[in-house]
Amino acid sequence: MIMDNFDSPFQYNRPEMTVEAIKKSIVYKLIFLIGRSPREASQRDWLNATLHAVRDLVTEGWITTARQTRAEDSRRVYYLSMEFLIGRTLSNAMIAEGIYGLAQEALSELNVDLEEVLEKEVDPGLGNGGLGRLAACFMDSIATLGLPGMGYGIRYEYGMFRQKIENGQQVERPDAWLEKGAPWEFIRPSKRFTVEFGGNIHFEGKKCIWQDTEKVTALAYDQMIPGYQNNSAATLRLWSAHAGEVFNLADFNRGEHLAALEEHSANKNLSRVLYPDDSTWNGRELRLRQEYFLVSASLQDILRRHKRTHNSLENLADKVAIHLNDTHPALAIPELMRILVDDEGFEWKKAWEMTRNIFSYTCHTLMSEALETWPVEMMAKILPRHLQMIFEINDHFLEYVRTYVTTDNDFIRRVSLIEEGYQRKVRMGWLSVVGSHKINGVAEIHSDLMVTSTFADFARIFPERFTNVTNGITPRRWLAVANPQLAALFDKYIGSEWRCDLSQIEKLKPFAQEKAFKEAVADIKFANKVKLAEYVKSELGVELDPHALFDVQVKRIHEYKRQMLNVLHIIARYNEMLTNPEKDWQPRVFILAGKAASAYYAAKQTIHLINDVANVINNDERLKGRLKVVFIPNYSVSLAQLIIPAADISEQISLAGTEASGTSNMKFALNGALTLGTLDGANVEILENVGEDNIFIFGNTVEQVEQLRREGYRSFEYYQNDAQLRTVVDQIIEGKFSPEDPQRYHQLLQGLQYHDYYQAFADFRSYVETQKAVDEKYKQRDQWIESTIQNIVNMGFFSSDRTIKEYAERIWKVEPVQLGD
């Protein structure tokens, strides 16, 4: 079809959504873009050709969205995040465009299996955990709601790392996700900006001059994020680092070849790896440079876009909202101030008012170690002007506090942006609060704790700034893509509106007692368990019984997430099964996955212990296959899409008061897993929505945790007073699970015996008893299926569409673009 209304007077052939048109497009891309004959093409060639063909279908809506946003002169939101864990793009895009079945049929006519092709796509290495996946869900919702929004991140060449398990231990390998090509992205050669580091500053009157800097070039790559069947797409712009000059030609011509290329290589390091090891000073410096690289390039682009439309920055705060996803992009606050004051000539107080009205900030943690701080000495070397600007902001802020709040020196010391001490530090969480007009927590309990603990002093100063926006997940990715059989069942019963309005899923409630519906849900769950078992058998060589209860904990490995508590229970169960072999034990499969930060010794030791325990249990014939433990390496979005639909139990067992929200709890519940968890994060709201009969809650509450700390928590007393716990701990310490190295876990377990900051020992007994209740309920098949369905049908609140609507209305003040058909 020739179209001329989209870009008149230019004519073009609009891609058609028919089997024949898609088939022709794929073959055309294969021959003329990939350069392969259909007779010789590999599955990866077919993947890339299909990606290009589907990309064509998304592109027109993407361009139309951008054009309409400009035409309406809409206020726009820009979402800054160090991570965007977007997952595979092809299946998501085909569902968004409504062509999954058409593409499947088109490829089938070419004797190509779509499912096999999809498995060839590599997950983009753009994130690690929940922070990045949340950002990806948010971008999906921004596109689906037609909001004028754009994401900014870094195009990491090697991601975080590819996790291998060798001799039970995590080994980090480069995640070379780009080596097979990235057909979904558009390189933007004209969108390149200079990012400056180092140098020195001096004042000429009131004007600050930043000079003699080291320069790096940021080059843009765009990813389209398609909205769900609305002919719209949002932009995720990712920055790649390049040398300011390709290399020093003068050095090269003098024969100093390595010196000439050294700077080039060092500058490219800024976008090589997500979260470089920060256990060294150099690693910390690289991470600080990365964060500034992101915000500098992004702000230059944002201001360029604004000036293109308005020719002035006077109305910047009226037309631009910038959101900080955690503290990583917090340098955007002093960077915007620097640009407005130094480059654009704004008066300081006006620039500060504009800045505060532009920025908003999501706090994702209550743990002080996760709220970034940077040594003043380091920032003075790398970003001298920004450190000076932070000092100015701090002086202005503390003057306000003394004038309008209190002159108490202890209070002023606590809220200062600069932490005084042996090593002075810049508090990035504090900077984010002071420089933003809204600060939100991500679950009700988290937001309450945020204003009563972490940011209590700031809530006294700025009570109107703090709010809650509970996290959500996109049902397109986490049901339609991850669990297509279940999605099709829901379509059959209530239509497909739930895909873009998850509250519609409650329409399934009348069918919750219907035998045919219950059996269909149970059959789909079993089929998903079979699929996961086949993967584990193929990849790990471990045989799993899909009739067993699949108990799953998949998330970043961290002490506060308490994978150790899970392991302690697994060993306790193992001991009981050997003591009482004739008991009618519910068969269980414990599935764990997640990465440990490369420098996080305790987390890496936990992975080693899990694998040692798995090795002993899986090879103990006395268990007769009734207990299995598997650690699945290299957890990713794609693996999550395989694991989550197969889970019966979702382990959400962080210490109460430590998990801000969590979103895997929502994904599991939406796919019919029952939550086993503490009263932490979004577990509290899941409990409120699904009802206490359909969730397993254990452990101390936030208040009880704090009371234990106040009174002096002594973990060794729990060890002494609980015989079962004592046996388990002694077995690990004595080397039962590491006979070749009996001392292996001494340090790890002694840390629990004498410190146990996250109170695993305190919650152990409650956890073990609750696990027994899980067994009993699972044996009542009909009751279990009813609870499965109750979890699903009561998850309507936990959509990222609802979350983003709240951000748009209450924080960003942006409205949807009026999109045509």
Curated annotation (Swiss-Prot):
Give residues where N6-(pyridoxal phosphate)lysine occurs: 667
Disulfide bonds, paired cysteine numbers: none
Task: Could you list this entry's UniProt keywords, alphabetically sorted.
Answer: Allosteric enzyme, Carbohydrate metabolism, Glycogen metabolism, Glycosyltransferase, Pyridoxal phosphate, Transferase
Molecular function GO labels: glycogen phosphorylase activity; pyridoxal phosphate binding
Q: Which cofactor does it need?
A: pyridoxal 5'-phosphate
The keyword Transferase is annotated on this UniProt entry: yes
- Transferase as a keyword of this entry, yes or no, is yes
Q: GO biological process: what's one of them?
A: glycogen catabolic process
Q: What is one Pfam family matched by this protein? A: Phosphorylase
Any idea of its EC number? 2.4.1.1
A cellular component annotation (GO) from this entry: cytoplasm
Per the record, what are the reactions this protein catalyses? [(1->4)-alpha-D-glucosyl](n) + phosphate = [(1->4)-alpha-D-glucosyl](n-1) + alpha-D-glucose 1-phosphate
Query: Which function does this protein serve?
Result: Phosphorylase is an important allosteric enzyme in carbohydrate metabolism. Enzymes from different sources differ in their regulatory mechanisms and in their natural substrates. However, all known phosphorylases share catalytic and structural properties.
Question: Which protein family is it in?
Answer: Belongs to the glycogen phosphorylase family.
Which named protein is this?
Glycogen phosphorylase
